[in-house]
A protein has these predicted regions:
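Conserved lysine of the Walker
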Residues: 77
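C-terminal engagement/docking regions of AAA+ P-loop ATPases
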Residues: 305, 325-489
Length: 489
C-alpha cells in the first residue's frame, strides 16, 4: 500500500487515488484510537507512567490539545514528545519544493498556491516520512522571533529583484517550516516573555506577522512544550496568556518503585557486550544503586526543587560497571563481580547531578555523595538482617556480637580496591561470623551474590556505628569502634 502511494507523483494522480488529507491532530487522534483498540503499547520504552502520565497524554491527544509537559529534569518529558512521532501516518504528500510542507489539497504558501494555479493536476508532489515531521527547539535567552517565525530576507529580495513590499521576500522561521509536524519547544520558561507573546496567535488563530506582513497562514501543527516548575527555574516563567492557550498541562514524576527505576537504568545504560560479559552485577547491587537516587530526592543536603534526574542512576550504573571492569583488567582477569566497595567509583556520577543547598555546599559534593551511599545502605540493611537498635541492653544477645568480637580481637581488616577476586573472597571468608549470620538470616540467598552480602554487613555495621571505616590510599580499613576511638586519644 505504501509503495503504491509513493508511486503517486502528481496532484491529479493523488486526487484519483481517493486520498483524504487530515490535520496532524486528527492523524494523532485516529492512530491513537487504533492503537488503543488493538491493545498495542502506545509509548513503548517509557516506564512508570502507565497509570499516571500516559493516560493523561492520551486524553490530551484525543482532545486535539497542544500539550505542556511539566516536571523536574530527567523525567522523560522530551522522550514522550519524541514518541508521539509513532502516532503519525507513515507518509504524507506535500507540494514538491514547498518550504512549509504544503498540503496539496490545502496549500497555504504563496509558492504552492501559484504552482498549483500554474500546473493544475500536473503539480508535482513528494512524500515525506513521519521521522521528518518532528522539529525541536531548545528555548534559550538568545532565541528571536525571526528564528521561530521568520523575517524579511534582503538577499532573497536582491536576487529576485523584489521590493520589501512583496511577501516573497519572507524567510520563514522554524515554526512555519514545521507545518504539519510535531513542534517541541524544550524549557519553555527560558524563552523571553516577548517571544512567548509571539506564539499567542499561532496557537489560537494561526496568524503570523513578519515585519509588517500580516500573513494569514492556518498552520497545521501539534505543539508540545516541556518545562520545569517555575519555582525552580529562576531564569523565567511561562506567561499566563500563553498557558491559557495550551490545552493540557501534564505533570510528570520520577519512578515510584525500585523495580521501575531498575528497568529504566537497564534500558538506558550504554554498555557493550564486553562489559556485560566481563562484569556480573548482583541483583541487590542494582537495587542499592537505585536506592541512592531515592535517598538523594529526600536528602536535606540537596535542593528538592531541582530534582535528581534518572540520568544519575544511569551514569552511576555505567561507572559501577567500569570500576569493576578496570579492576579485572588490572588483575588480568576475564570476569569479576561488582563489590560494595566499587560504589565509591560512582561518586563522580553523583556530584555533577545534584544541586546542593547551603548545608550541602558546606559539606562538599563528594562528602554528600558518600552520605547518600551510606543512607542507601542504612535503608537496605534491615530488609536482610535484624534491625540494629541505638541502645541495646544486652550486647551479648545481639546477632552481631560475634562479628564485633572478631573485630575487637583483630588489629584491623582491609578491603583493597584492586584485590583479585580470590583475595577478596578469602578475606571475607576469614570472618566466620559473617557466614554464620548469612546462614541464619539469609540461608537461601544466591551463592554468587553472597560476598556482596557479606560486605553489606560490614558497611551496615559502620552506618549503625558498630564498626569504624577509614579510607586508606588503596582501599578501606574496618576496625572495632572502641579500639579506633582509643587509638585516636
Amino acid at each position: 500500500m505504501i509503495n503504491k502511494m509513493k508511486d503517486i507523483q502528481t496532484l491529479g494522480q493523488l486526487e484519483k487515488s481517493g486520498y483524504v488529507s487530515k490535520s496532524i491532530k486528527d492523524e494523532l487522534r485516529d492512530n491513537l484510537r487504533a492503537k488503543i483498540k488493538s491493545g498495542k503499547p502506545v509509548f513503548e520504552g517509557v516506564h512508570g507512567f502507565e497509570n499516571t502520565v500516559i493516560p493523561e497524554l492520551e486524553r490530551a491527544i484525543l482532545s486535539r490539545h497542544n500539550i505542556n509537559l511539566l516536571g523536574l529534569r530527567g523525567q522523560a518529558k522530551t522522550r514522550l514528545a519524541r514518541k508521539m512521532i509513532e502516532l503519525l501516518d507513515e507518509y504524507i504528500p506535500i507540494v514538491a519544493g514547498s518550504e512549509i510542507n504544503d498540503d496539496p489539497f490545502n496549500p497555504i504558501s504563496r509558492f504552492a498556491i501559484d504552482l498549483i494555479a500554474e500546473k493544475g493536476e500536473a503539480t508535482p508532489i513528494q512524500w515525506i516520512h513521519r521521522s521528518e515531521r518532528f522539529a525541536e527547539k531548545l528555548a534559550t535567552p538568545d532565541v528571536t522571533v525571526a528564528d521561530l517565525i521568520g523575517d524579511v530576507d534582503p538577499i532573497k529580495a536582491a536576487n529576485l529583484k523584489l521590493s520589501y513590499a512583496d511577501d516573497r521576500v519572507i524567510h520563514f522561521g522554524m515554526i512555519p517550516r514545521a507545518n504539519r509536524c510535531i513542534f517541541v519547544i524544550n524549557e519553555l520558561p527560558d524563552l523571553q516573555a516577548r517571544i512567548q507573546v509571539a506564539l499567542f496567535n499561532i496557537l489560537q488563530e494561526g496568524d503570523i506577522q513578519i515585519r509588517g506582513f500580516k500573513v494569514r497562514m492556518p498552520l497545521d501543527m501539534q505543539f508540545v512544550f516541556t518545562a520545569n516548575p517555575e519555582d525552580y527555574t529562576n531564569r523565567g516563567s511561562i506567561v499566563t496568556p500563553l498557558k491559557d492557550r495550551i490545552g493540557s498541562q501534564i505533570l510528570t514524576h520520577y519512578p515510584e518503585t525500585l523495580a521501575i527505576a531498575r528497568t529504566i537504568t537497564h534500558q538506558e545504560a550504554k554498555l557493550n557486550s564486553v562489559q556485560t560479559e566481563a562484569v556480573y552485577v548482583p541483583s541487590i547491587a542494582k537495587d542499592l544503586l537505585e536506592q541512592i537516587s531515592f535517598e538523594a530526592r529526600e536528602s536535606e543536603f540537596i535542593d528538592a526543587k531541582s530534582g535528581v534526574s534518572a540520568r544519575m542512576s544511569i551514569t552511576a550504573f555505567e561507572n559501577l560497571i567500569s570500576t569493576a571492569e578496570r579492576r579485572a583488567l588490572l588483575n588480568g582477569s576475564d570476569h569479576t563481580s561488582v563489590r560494595l566497595s566499587d560504589f565509591m567509583g560512582i561518586i563522580p556520577a553523583i556530584t555533577g547531578k545534584v544541586e546542593l543547598v547551603y548545608e550541602g555546599e558546606q559539606e562538599g559534593a563528594a562528602v554528600v555523595a558518600q552520605h547518600l551511599i551510606g543512607d542507601a545502605i542504612r535503608t537496605f540493611f534491615p530488609a536482610y538482617f535484624p534491625k540494629i537498635e541505638k541502645l541495646e541492653r544486652d550486647a551479648d544477645a545481639s546477632p552481631y556480637a560475634k562479628i564485633l568480637e572478631w573485630f575487637f580481637a583483630e588489629t584491623g581488616f582491609e578491603l583493597l580496591d584492586d584485590a583479585t577476586d580470590d583475595t577478596y573472597q578469602k578475606q571475607l571468608d576469614a570472618i566466620q561470623p559473617l557466614e554464620d549470620l548469612i546462614q541464619k538470616y539469609q540461608p537461601e540467598f544466591p551463592v554468587k551474590d553472597k560476598y556482596f552480602l557479606k560486605e553489606l554487613i560490614l558497611w551496615g555495621l559502620v552506618e549503625y556505628n558498630k564498626l569504624s571505616k577509614d579510607r586508606i590510599a588503596v582501599g578501606y580499613q574496618f576496625k572495632d569502634l572502641y579500639s579506633s576511638y582509643i587509638n585516636k586519644l
